[in-house]
Amino acid sequence: MEIFPAIDLKKGRCVRLYQGEFSKETVMNEDPVAQAIIFETFGAKRLHIVDLDGAVAGESLNLSVIERICKAVRIPVQVGGGIRSLVAVEKLFSVGVDKVILGTAALYDKPFLEEAVFLYKEKIIVGIDAKNGFVATRGWLDVSEISYIDLAKQMENIGVQTIVFTDISKDGTLAGPNIAQLELLQKSVSTRLIASGGIASIQDVKKLNDMNIYGVIIGKALYEKTIDLEEVLEVTKLC
């Protein structure tokens, strides 16, 4: 299982939100580059970065920070948030990003998504964020009438190989992942699944590992120290 420490960017700082609410933010580190280096130092093999400002604005607003992170660490970095054109995708790859996560575009701009997948294959990940089972977009501000399962099936048909699934109600809560939704998703598609939202303990990670989930994104639990990064990396290596 792959472990992805999370860095959420807002106004150039590393923050955490509670249930996706932009008004409920906590600054975890004023220096995201330093935070990335800390994660790498403690053994992280890859990083997950979200440009929260970009997710709302529809364009990357923290590109310079992302570039500095990519230059500061030697591990692969995947980035999502506000990526809605091929130019934006190419710009991220040009500054050293390993994989790009498309969210809103997956729902509203299928031609762009199809072209991106055609050009970059497994380098394109789709992020599906759900609220009460329905897909949320534009920085989680809009909730659609499309179920997360239906969108996942569409993505698989297009050729998407990896999906990041987030249950928004769990994000930043340390309440544990939504196992039921993940199980249903697993039964519905054969893509790789990366679970995000609510991961609070080593036990949560073990449970997801037992389900053969490909990867887990861990944010608040690392900052609040309810999960030790070195320990979780060791545990998943032994599983």
Curated annotation (Swiss-Prot):
Belongs to the HisA/HisF family. CDD domains: HisA. One of its GO terms (biological process) is L-histidine biosynthetic process. It comes from Bacillus cereus (strain ATCC 10987 / NRS 248). It comes from the Bacteria. This is 1-(5-phosphoribosyl)-5-[(5-phosphoribosylamino)methylideneamino] imidazole-4-carboxamide isomerase. Coiled coil: none annotated. Pathway: Amino-acid biosynthesis; L-histidine biosynthesis; L-histidine from 5-phospho-alpha-D-ribose 1-diphosphate: step 4/9. Keywords: Amino-acid biosynthesis, Cytoplasm, Histidine biosynthesis, Isomerase. It catalyses: 1-(5-phospho-beta-D-ribosyl)-5-[(5-phospho-beta-D-ribosylamino)methylideneamino]imidazole-4-carboxamide = 5-[(5-phospho-1-deoxy-D-ribulos-1-ylimino)methylamino]-1-(5-phospho-beta-D-ribosyl)imidazole-4-carboxamide. Its main location: cytoplasm. It holds the Pfam family His_biosynth. GO terms for cellular component: cytoplasm. Gene3D superfamilies: Aldolase class I (3.20.20.70). InterPro entries: Aldolase_TIM, His_biosynth, HisA_bact_arch, Isoase_HisA-like, Isoase_HisA-like_bact, RibuloseP-bd_barrel. Its EC number is 5.3.1.16. GO terms for molecular function: 1-(5-phosphoribosyl)-5-[(5-phosphoribosylamino)methylideneamino]imidazole-4-carboxamide isomerase activity. The active site is at D8, D129.
